[in-house]
Structures are given as structure tokens and as C-alpha cells.
């Protein structure tokens, strides 16, 4: 989150943001956004056991139920069936073995679920080679050990 607060390349304020946390796992990113003032977060996690841990995390942290929604659907299904919803932060953290996430990103872009001021954050393995430059304008790529974080905005 420091890069969001202190970057001269990424100009984005989390306060009042509407966050779509795809492949959310136990919800670390979305929960952090809520703690920093995001309006709400939608967590999309198809694994029921993992989403149960996510629910427990939200409960343990006493996060207001109006600040989040959890769905146990496939990511692409959620996007296809919720096109009317608009978000300005999109976080994608697919399993490292998932090479198909660019298709998910493309579906999000084509669905027009993003507000004009938006930020896309993708967490991948540092050696991954998937190309998303036809879907997002890549602002910055940061490597952290085995991970890389891609920051961008949807292309119009």
C-alpha cells in the first residue's frame, strides 16, 4: 500500500473506493482497503473453505456488514452477471498456475464495470509472462521475491 500512497506514477486515493477483489482468498487486500477507508469491497472466492476463513477474518475484525459482500462464484460468472456494478479498484490474485487470468481481465474490461478513475492491481509469480498490455495501460511493475505486482488502468 505504500506504493499507492507515495508513488508519483500511481495517483489513486483508496478512501471511498469501490473495490472488486477477484480470486480474493482470505481477503487480505480487500480488508486492507476497507481499513483504509474504501466504501466497500466485493470478494469473489469460489473455494468455500477459503471463503469461510475470509468470513471469519471479517467477523474477527468486526468489519461492518455494509462494507463488504462475499460471493462463492467463478470469477468470470460473477463479472458476466454483475455488469451493472461499477468499481474503481480491481485486484486480481489468481493462483500462480492460472494462465487464463488475462481472459478474466478482458471480460471485466468488456463488461464496462470500471469507473473512469480506476486502478488494476495484479499479483503474479515474478517469472510469469502473460501479456495484458492490450487490456490495461501498465503504469508500474514491482518485483518482490517470488511475486510481481502489476499496476495499471483499463484502456478505453
Predicted feature residues:
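Class I S-adenosyl-L-methionine-dependent methyltransferase catalytic core
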Residues: 1-156
